[in-house]
Amino acid sequence: MSNAPYDPATEGARMNFKGRMSYGDYLMLERLLDAQAPLSSAHDELLFIIQHQTSELWMKLAIHEIKAAMAAIARDDVQPAFKMLARVSRIFEQLNGAWDVLRTMTPSEYTLFRDKLGESSGFQSFQYRSIEFLLGNRNLAMLRPHAHHPELTAELESILAKPSLYDEALRLLARRGFFIGADGQRTDWRGTRAESAEVAAAWTSVYRDPQRHWELYELAEKLVDFEDYFRRWRFNHVTTVERIIGFKTGTGGTSGVNYLRKMLEIVLFPELWKLRTGL
C-alpha cells in the first residue's frame, strides 16, 4: 500500500480550471463571501450578519417554491405543489435551526455592536414581507417601510394584486364543487381575508372523506405542515430576541418582544386548524 498523498487527478478529476468554470465561479463565491461588512470590531457581529444573510437566501428559495406551488394549484396540477410545499416546510425547519446558532451570542456581546445597526430591523425585510403577503397575511401598513424603494413597493403591490397561496387553495375547492361563500366571489385580493363558516364546512367535508377528496386533503395537510413550521420559526424568533435584548425597544422602533408576540397570534389558514375540533 502506497503512503503517497491521494491525488484525485489519477482518477480523472480535473485539477486545472484556467479558462473553465469552477465551483467558486458557478456559485459566485467571491461576491458572496465579500458581502459581509461588519461596522464594528466586535467578534460576534459577523455571526449576526451571516445569520440574517443566510436567512434571506433561504427566504428567496421559499418564495420561489411558494410561487411555483401557487401556479401549480391554479392550473389544477396539484401534486407537484405537494413537493414544493414540503420543501418550504423543510426550509423553515432549517431556519429554525439557525436560531440555535444565533442564541450562542450573549446580551453583553450584542451590546458591543447593536448601536451600529441604526434603525435597521428584521421587520423591514422585503422578502419576509413578500412571504407574509404570499401566504395571505396582508397588512397594508407594512408597505410603508419599503416606500423609499419604489421597485420593491411595486413588487409587493404585484403580490397583493393576486390571490394568496390560501386563496388559490380555496379557488381549487370551488372548482372541485365545494361552496365557499364570499370567497368564491372575491376579486380584490389586497386585504387579509376574513374567516368563513362556508370555507370551514367545505374543508370539514374533505376531512370526513379523505379518500374521495385525496388531493384536497393532502394539500390541506401540506398547508398545515407549513404553518406548523412557520409558527415555530416565529416562536423561536421571539425567544431568541427576549434572550438577547429582553424587553428593550427594537432597533426599528417596534416594541421588540411584545411586537413579535403579537405576530404569534396570526393564523394563516384558520379553517384548517379549527375543523379539527369538530371531526
Curated annotation (Swiss-Prot):
Gene name of the encoded protein: kynA
InterPro entries: Trp/Indoleamine_2_3_dOase-like, Trp_2-3-dOase_bac, Trp_2_3_dOase
Chain sites annotated for binding heme: 237
Cofactor(s) the record lists: heme
One Pfam family matching this protein: Trp_dioxygenase
Protein known as: Tryptophan 2,3-dioxygenase
Reactions catalysed according to its record: L-tryptophan + O2 = N-formyl-L-kynurenine
Quaternary structure note: Homotetramer.
Keyword set, alphabetical order: Dioxygenase, Heme, Iron, Metal-binding, Oxidoreductase, Tryptophan catabolism
GO terms, biological process: L-tryptophan catabolic process to acetyl-CoA; L-tryptophan catabolic process to kynurenine
Enzyme class (EC, first level): oxidoreductase
Translocase in keyword set: no
Binding site for substrate: 48-52, 110, 114, 251
EC number: 1.13.11.11
